[in-house]
Amino acid sequence: RILDAAYEAAKGSAKIGTTGKGIGPTYTDKVSRNGMRVGDVLSADFRQIYARAKARHESILRGLGYEYDIAELERKWFEAVEYLKRFNIIDSEYFVNECLAQDKSILAEGAQGTLLDVDFGSYPFVTSSNTVCAGACVGLGIAPNRIGEVYGIFKAYCTRVGSGPFPTELFDETGARMRSIGHEYGAVTGRERRCGWLDLVALKYSIMINGVTQLIMMKSDVMNDFETVKVATEYEVGGERTAHFPYEIGDDLKPVYREFEGWKCDLRDCKSYDDFPAAFKAYVEFIERLSLIHISEPTRQA
């Protein structure tokens, strides 16, 4: 965490809005082949492994000129290590593949959106790992051909925490309403999420990268009382329109919107698709038509 704070401070106004939990520095250690692994806590040389990592990190902090006090964090960290030792630490890749061999169902849930992926997201405003579907393969140790259905879960509007490009962001009362009604605050930091209209360019890009087979839309009830609802279908850059997600999103990029009539009812009262108002169905079917993917839903008995 201290390294995370030091790196952010060194970037000044160019900071990326990290959660400050030390995720980036942890991945830096991993990629440089200096990182500690969970299995190390069981090693007889654990203290020496830790001491080497600590010395390396302190050298970086001195180079950045960052003042810090590690005592309290270090105490909590060693408490966490002792807690971790209580668990049965296994080679999980064998466990998962044995379950697959027994025809057991495994649900892998991603914690972050496609545009936070370190390779395919809005770099450098990304996390340090692969948040796309392929990340499940390297995260679990399974082959790509073992993946079955890929469910693309998205909100009926867009949100983002921290810095980074957001073409459909709303800076007005509408965006504030989305945030308030949708309780849009960061799960880790509690920061206000930036809110905006649904971006179909970004959604279609995410569908392509992940190989999505079914879409699941959530939080459409946040806009129950909206008079109109908009969807970005294309971007306009330099006077030309494109439906491709660009390598870099600059200030000259403008979203092109399609406006829909609001459904003006409480969707929570609907028990099946037939119960939905025509305005909401038009919104859903438009997204399906442009994304070429069906929006599915659980039954009320699921």
Predicted feature descriptions by range:
Residues 1-290:
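TRNA-recognition modules of translation machinery and tRNA-sensing kinases, especially anticodon-binding
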Residues 194, 298-299:
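A subset of signal/propeptide-processing and intrinsically disordered low-complexity segments
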Residues 293-294, 301-302:
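Single conserved hydrophobic/aromatic residue that forms the stacking wall/gate
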